[in-house]
From Swiss-Prot:
Binding site for IMP: D14, E15, G16, K17, N39, A40, G41, H42, T131, R145, Q226, T241, R309
Active-site residues, Swiss-Prot/TrEMBL: D14, H42
Identification of the protein by name: Adenylosuccinate synthetase
Keyword Metal-binding: yes
PANTHER family: ADENYLOSUCCINATE SYNTHETASE
Subunit comment: Homodimer.
Listed cofactors: Mg(2+)
Cellular component terms (Gene Ontology): cytoplasm
Catalytic activity: IMP + L-aspartate + GTP = N(6)-(1,2-dicarboxyethyl)-AMP + GDP + phosphate + 2 H(+)
GO terms assigned for molecular function: adenylosuccinate synthase activity; GTP binding; magnesium ion binding
Sites where the protein binds GTP: 13-19, 41-43, 311, 337-339, 419-421
């Protein structure tokens, strides 16, 4: 019987979703991206090869698995083709297995120009930490009903007319409000038409194809990008991304009914990280040698896949995790990077906050309130042994098992999967999402 699983990040992104999606793909007929754009990065380690992906679903490295880019994704066609060529150079067949929704809004040159100019104009304290890739301005165009979509690539005249109108609007903002250079019509149009020749053969009715896969008994894996705490509605607004990163978006962003989402796997690191601006209650010093934060940063190789920026690091925040569990309807958790904590004498779990003199047990919604939150910690013993590469629960040190049990107790949700390294087999399975 077909079963559909949604994988979402429960933190601020970078939770290790790519490896888990790849690991789960053995049981899926297809993998679906349903939100975000090429601002999200995921890294897969397969044998001696490392693949850094932004737009192509992680299932592409599994032979015979179909991959879908749903209507909720904003698409930089030029970047997608560059990514495809890198994969093809590595011997991976992509074009015959990748299907793109005609409803995807297109990221064009003026979107990136707007993104960069706006961020440059902000005061340092107001900077979001955008990747500057045009994601936000493209979603703005979508909501304003002026976006050019993949569908428009089929008609040169329609595309040209819409592009001309959009450039008149956006170039006014760029030149008159932001003091930036205008973006030329020919440059954007010519690149889009050149890309269209390669993109259009991969365009398909994604919603109908996903329905057909399920009807034939095939299971699907929905791959979330970024993380719940970056969600445009539920995250630490305004220090968020421009899309919905939560499990419910899997339905809207791909064209499947919510009743066909059967299991939600929430991915969380054994600690917390964040890239860019915004409040982070459990943040630690990552620069001082010998400190827990510095170990998380260096041992965890905490640098952004897309930007290369150092990630901020801190203790695992269970008040934030519980908020994510509620929002996503998480069925089970997957803990990643447990091995990064190996060797620390003691560990701390944030179980709640003091906010304006009162204790609260869930992350508040406004970033101003989150900034005022002071974490309440519970201290646990660390472990001297290694968890790296462990493949069974019993192979973990007793203190590591106690740490995981405490997370389950406080969050009232089972930990079904534990990742102990980047390779596929460095995984502990307690309950399989496709079998649960």
């Amino acid at each position: 019987m077909a079963k559909n699983v949604v994988v979402v990040g429960t933190q601020w992104g970078d939770e290790g979703k790519g490896k888990i999606v790849d690991w789960l793909t053995d049981h899926a007929r297809g993998v679906v991206r349903f939100q975000g754009g090429h601002n999200a990065g995921h890294t897969l380690v397969i044998g001696q090869k490392e693949y850094k992906l932004n737009l192509v679903p992680s299932g592409i490295v599994r032979e015979g698995v179909a991959c879908y880019i749903g209507n909720g994704v904003v698409l930089d066609a030029h970047h997608l083709l560059s990514e495809i060529r890198v994969l093809e150079a590595g011997g991976i067949k992509v074009r015959e297995r990748l299907r793109i929704s005609p409803g995807c809004p297109l990221i064009l040159g003026y979107h990136a120009a707007l993104d960069r100019a706006r961020e440059a104009a902000k005061a340092a304290c107001d900077k979001i930490g955008t990747t500057g890739k045009g994601i936000g301005p493209t979603y703005e165009d979508k909501v304003a009903r002026r976006a050019l979509r993949v569908y428009d690539l089929f008609d040169r005249e329609r595309f040209a007319a819409k592009l001309k109108a959009n450039l008149e609007y956006h170039n006014f903002v760029l030149t008159q409000h932001l003091g930036a250079e205008p973006v030329g019509f020919d440059e954007v149009f010519d690149e889009a038409m050149a890309d269209a020749a390669e993109i259009l053969p991969m365009v398909a009715d994604v919603s109908a194809e996903l329905y057909a896969v399920n009807k034939a008994g095939g299971s699907l894996l929905f791959e979330g990008a970024q993380g719940t705490l970056l969600d445009i509605d539920h995250g630490t607004y305004p220090f968020v991304t421009s899309s919905n990163c939560v499990a419910g978006q899997a339905a809207a962003g791909s064209g499947v009914g919510p009743g066909r989402l059967h299991y939600v796997l929430g991915i969380t690191k054994a600690y917390c990280t964040r890239v860019g601006g915004g409040p982070f209650p459990t943040e630690l010093d990552i620069e001082t040698p010998g400190t827990p934060g510095q170990q998380m940063s260096t041992k965890g190789r905490e640098f952004g896949t897309v930007t290369g920026r150092k990630r901020r690091c801190g203790w695992l925040d269970l008040a934030a995790l519980k908020r994510s569990i509620i929002i996503n309807g998480v069925t089970g958790l997957c803990i990643t990077k447990l091995d990064v904590l190996d060797g620390l004498a003691e560990l701390k779990l944030c179980t709640g906050y003091m906010l304006d003199g009162k204790r609260i047990d869930l992350l508040p919604m406004g970033s101003e309130e989150v900034t005022r939150c002071e974490p309440i910690y519970e201290t646990l013993s660390g472990w001297s042994g290694t968890t790296f590469g462990a493949q069974s629960w019993d192979a973990l040190p007793q203190e590591a098992r106690a740490y995981l049990h405490r997370i389950e107790e406080i969050c009232e949700i089972p930990i079904d999967v534990i990742s102990t390294g980047p390779e596929r087999d460095e995984t502990i399975l307690r309950r399989h999402p496709f079998g649960a």
